[in-house]
Amino acid sequence: DILTLPAAGSEESDSCVISDETTHTKTGFGSPLMRPVFSIMNPELTYTLPPYQTACGSMDIMAHAMERYFSHTQNVEMTDRVTEAILTTVIHNLSVVLEKPDDYAARAEIMLCGTWAQNDMTGCGRAQDWFNHGLEHQISGFYDIAHGAGLAISFPAWMEFLCGKEECIPRLAQYAVRVWNAEMNFDNPEETAREGIKRLRGLIKEAGLPLTLSEAGVGKEKFEEIADNMTNGGSHTCGAFYAFT
């Protein structure tokens, strides 16, 4: 594997996505046999990436980390901290490379974050969510939208919805404090959680990514089909941090 776009983590991942253009469906597939035996990771190969693709890739990296981070599994302090380090490193270095595309150190940091976010070390011993990836796969099955751009739309909206679920607020507030350096409001942790979402949206906007489906040219006409594809005709729920039906 020769890495040219830090995002999917294919250099150490056991996962891939299979697309069926006739049914407009995308399905994730994973096996230990998928992991590369050898990968070449040279940050210089990413210097010429367009800013939009750089931003999309960075959002995908953050999404891989957050799919594992948002979990109700207890006593996962070490993997929490590693995931937070991945997220804060991407946040810092994305702004650097968008300003200076040939910054070797910043490109290298993002590249390594992409690897660690998807080799599943941060998912060790904990339940993982994956609602947002499942949703984005179905959206991009119908519409021409970059994966990272779709995740930039779905993740903040998903977080905002979960602010209304009491069992989810503690972790959302922890994310806001540890990743975005928000001040913890112990009297109103939901307010802290919403501050983290606000700061995530700020990064997405600064990076030039869409925040709404309409910005990305996605209408409402396929919503029912997307939901049907996600739930396999309503036969199962989606997500572990919060189960959608």
Task: Report the location of each language-model feature.
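Active-site segments that bind and position negatively charged phosphate/pyrophosphate groups
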Residues: 68-199
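A glycine/threonine-rich phosphate-anchoring loop and its flanking beta-alpha core
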Residues: 1-78, 170, 174
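C-terminal charged capping/lid subdomain of soluble metabolic enzymes
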Residues: 176-245
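Alpha-helical architecture
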Residues: 1, 40, 58, 131, ...
